[in-house]
């Protein structure tokens, strides 16, 4: 039985910091970001099904979100202003991501590749799945901005403004619900969110 470096590579996602050009009060790595995106994507899928007559698989969407940035273990986290500087760079970076995704899939033992390929390669996502993961990704970036701003770090003001436009473009009923029900708490301190339910 041959060895696979797949999970050894994925474990290094925690070494890749997000927002590399920004001063951060608290650094965020790709591994923890992926977990938060998975939780939010799962919630969006549940909300879509329960409140807005959706028919998506929340558990699959959580898994897709968990792996959505896995290729960054090979490419690094390219800053957004660089990634989207122009359409040519954006196109080439997408091609690089695709190569990285295929390289990761090739690391998986052949008898398991049919399970992992649809998680790592977004071309296997349905439109609903892709939309929910992208919404969750943008929401989590927005939440990071709120956390930094609430800690007094104005470095994230423009990023917050840019992400508000992104969220408006990716708007959905389930996102509106999430924004109204869950996001306001991110403006509060620990004392404020725990005062109604002390341990």
UniProtKB/Swiss-Prot annotation:
Keyword ATP-binding among UniProt keywords: no
Top-level division of the source organism's lineage: Bacteria
CDD domains linked to this entry: HDc
Residues reported in the UniProt entry to bind a divalent metal cation: 33, 68-69, 137
Binding site for substrate: 18-19, 33, 69, 77-80, 137
Segments crossing the lipid bilayer: none
Signal peptide: none
Obligatory cofactor(s): a divalent metal cation
Catalysis: reaction(s): a 2'-deoxyribonucleoside 5'-phosphate + H2O = a 2'-deoxyribonucleoside + phosphate
Domain HD: 30-142
Cellular location(s): Cytoplasm
Pfam families linked: YfbR-like
GO cellular component: cytoplasm
GO MF, any single term: nucleotide binding
E.C. code: 3.1.3.89
Function: Catalyzes the strictly specific dephosphorylation of 2'-deoxyribonucleoside 5'-monophosphates.
Assembly information from the UniProt record: Homodimer.
Protein name: 5'-deoxynucleotidase ESA_00928
Organism: Cronobacter sakazakii (strain ATCC BAA-894)
Lineage: Bacteria, Pseudomonadati, Pseudomonadota, Gammaproteobacteria, Enterobacterales
């Amino acid at each position: 039985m041959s060895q696979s470096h797949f999970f050894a590579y994925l474990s290094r996602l925690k070494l890749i910091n997000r927002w590399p050009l920004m001063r951060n009060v608290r650094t965020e790595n790709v591994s923890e970001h992926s977990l938060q995106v998975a939780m939010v994507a799962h919630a969006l899928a549940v909300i879509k099904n329960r409140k807005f007559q959706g028919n998506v698989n929340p558990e699959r969407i959580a898994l897709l979100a968990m792996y959505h940035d896995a290729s960054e273990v090979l490419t690094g986290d390219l800053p957004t202003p660089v990634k989207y500087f122009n359409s040519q760079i954006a196109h080439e970076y997408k091609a690089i991501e695709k190569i990285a995704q295929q390289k990761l899939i090739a690391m998986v033992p052949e008898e398991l590749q049919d399970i992992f390929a649809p998680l790592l390669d977004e071309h296997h996502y349905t439109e609903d799945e892709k939309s929910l993961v992208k919404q969750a990704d943008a929401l989590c970036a927005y939440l990071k901005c709120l956390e930094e701003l609430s800690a007094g770090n104005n470095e994230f003001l423009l990023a917050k403004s840019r992400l508000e436009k992104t969220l408006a473009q990716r708007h959905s009923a389930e996102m509106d619900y999430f924004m109204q029900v869950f996001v306001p708490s991110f403006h509060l301190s620990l004392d404020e969110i725990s005062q109604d339910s002390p341990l």
